[in-house]
């Protein structure tokens, strides 16, 4: 039992009301500190046993000295599957029970986005170290509270942006900055171009399975009817529980850009504009499936294009784009570099390949890095410390905020906006055109 804990004495509604009132005062709690035992073992508990949770269970189980000591999920079917994989692990439906258990040294959080911060704060309050999946926060306020909790309770806290642990990243930074292999950096283009499908639009609310503890699944989210076809995974495309493609894939690429191009010197953009919408599909989602973003960083400008619709109606191919579908292009005075998860290629001015980079995407090594920090009690060796993770997540939250604050498309917003907005609008127009849509079509918004 954690005396005085906000965790133990709050309901979903109370958490929402407290947050809206201006902030949560982090309670002082007993802080058991992990210490080396004879076998240097770390007992890890998992909150969230779905797709990503299962991948992380596999990764952590391969780290020497790590025991999968607990699994937790409000979905009974997923929990049972996790128990079958790790029969020696304790199993809970309520994350608070896992967090309270004194045998658990560290917690891995792979829930829906809206649970990330609250679960992390509760775990750190209980003296656990935390590995939390990306994006860190569902809102920037939550992220700041999580950073504060890590500092207050002296916890090791790592964000699941595993590409930070890919050795390739250091090689690329040396090539671009120290060696000046392509000259001066001029601009950056970020791409997330990948076809997805409609999530459906029911005429009646989705029935929640009887074996799901829906109140625990909702947590701090608003209890409202769901009209999509599936409860799981497609929560990404609902602002109530997800962060859209920007928080799903965009966080990985933008984190790479912050790391490789800016070397974390730029915390957040100074100005940001967005144009896009949710078009083509008449479904229950409310996050954009096409979005162009311009970011003023105070130095190197960043453009981002996001497209989940196909190149043409009924097609399966993505719209045409320069560079990787999920990656980024660093335009330089002497050529350009194209980076993606696990690999990268540098080209000269004439488009000739002059150097390639090969990595491991950080899978496995990122989890090892977290455990190393837990054992050494040294957050400085983390490759994706919670402060860095909060800053990278902020880029996604700001891009989403720019979209949500936007209004019906007005050419003046583009004409008098950031320099790259005209190019971004033209790019969006080309993606929309095969579907019989344009910038003036219903659903297209600009900020």
Identify what each model region corresponds to:
Residues 112, 117-165:
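Beta-strand-loop-alpha-helix segment that lines the small-molecule cofactor/substrate pocket
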Residues 107-108:
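N-terminal Rossmann-like NAD(P) cofactor-binding module of classical short-chain dehydrogenase/reductase
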Residues 149-155, 171-186, 199, 205-208:
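Basic phosphate/pyrophosphate-binding loop/patch that engages nucleotide-derived ligands
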Residues 189-230:
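Core domains of carbohydrate- and sulfate-ester-processing enzymes
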Residues 18-86, 163-166, 257:
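N-terminal Rossmann-like dinucleotide-binding module
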Residues 18-23, 55, 228, 245-261, ...:
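C-terminal helical cap and adjacent loop that interface with cofactors, partners, or active-site loops
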Residues 2-23:
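N-terminal secretory signal peptides and thylakoid transit peptides that target proteins
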Residues 215-301, 307-315, 387-391:
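Rossmann-like dinucleotide-binding domain that binds NAD(P)(H)
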């Amino acid at each position: 039992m954690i005396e005085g804990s906000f965790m133990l004495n709050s309901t979903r509604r109370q958490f929402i009301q407290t947050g809206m009132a201006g902030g949560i005062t982090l309670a002082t709690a007993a802080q058991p500190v992990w210490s080396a035992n004879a076998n240097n073992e770390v007992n890890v508990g998992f909150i969230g046993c779905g797709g990503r949770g299962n991948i992380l269970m596999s990764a952590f189980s391969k780290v020497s000295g790590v025991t999968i000591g607990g699994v937790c999920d409000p979905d009974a079917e997923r929990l049972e599957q996790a128990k079958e994989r790790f029969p020696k692990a304790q199993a809970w439906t309520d994350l608070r029970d896992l967090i309270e258990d004194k045998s658990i040294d560290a917690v891995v959080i792979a829930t829906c986005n809206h649970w990330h911060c609250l679960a992390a704060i509760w775990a750190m309050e209980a003296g656990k170290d935390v590995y939390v999946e990306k994006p860190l926060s569902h809102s920037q306020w939550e992220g700041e509270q999580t950073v504060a909790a890590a500092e207050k309770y002296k916890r090791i806290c790592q964000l699941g942006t595993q590409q930070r642990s890919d050795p390739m990243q250091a090689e690329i930074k040396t090539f671009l900055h120290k060696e000046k292999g392509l000259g001066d950096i001029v601009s950056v283009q970020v791409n997330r171009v990948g076809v997805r499908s409609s999530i459906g639009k029911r005429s009646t609310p989705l029935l929640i399975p009887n074996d799901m503890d829906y109140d625990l699944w909702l947590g701090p989210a608003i209890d409202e009817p769901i009209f999509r076809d599936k409860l799981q995974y497609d929560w990404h495309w609902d602002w109530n529980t997800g962060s859209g493609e920007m928080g799903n894939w965009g966080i990985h690429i933008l984190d790479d850009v912050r790391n490789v191009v800016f070397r974390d010197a730029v915390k957040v953009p100074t100005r940001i504009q967005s144009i896009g919408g949710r078009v083509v599909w008449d479904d229950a989602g409310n996050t954009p499936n096409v979005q162009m973003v311009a970011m003023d960083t105070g130095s190197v400008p960043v453009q981002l294009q996001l497209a989940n619709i196909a190149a043409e109606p009924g097609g399966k191919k993505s719209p045409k784009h320069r560079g990787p579908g999920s990656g980024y292009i660093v335009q330089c005075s002497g050529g350009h570099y194209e980076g993606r998860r696990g690999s990268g290629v540098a080209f000269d001015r004439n488009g000739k390949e002059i150097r390639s980079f090969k990595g491991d995407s950080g899978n496995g090594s990122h989890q090892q890095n977290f455990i190393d920090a837990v054992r050494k009690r040294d957050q400085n060796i983390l490759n994706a410390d919670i402060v860095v993770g909060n800053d990278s997540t902020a880029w996604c939250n700001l891009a989403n905020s720019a979209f949500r604050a936007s209004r019906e498309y007005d050419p003046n917003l583009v004409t008098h906006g950031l320099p790259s907005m005209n190019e971004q609008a033209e790019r969006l127009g080309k993606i929309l055109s095969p579907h019989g849509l344009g910038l003036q079509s219903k659903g297209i918004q600009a900020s």
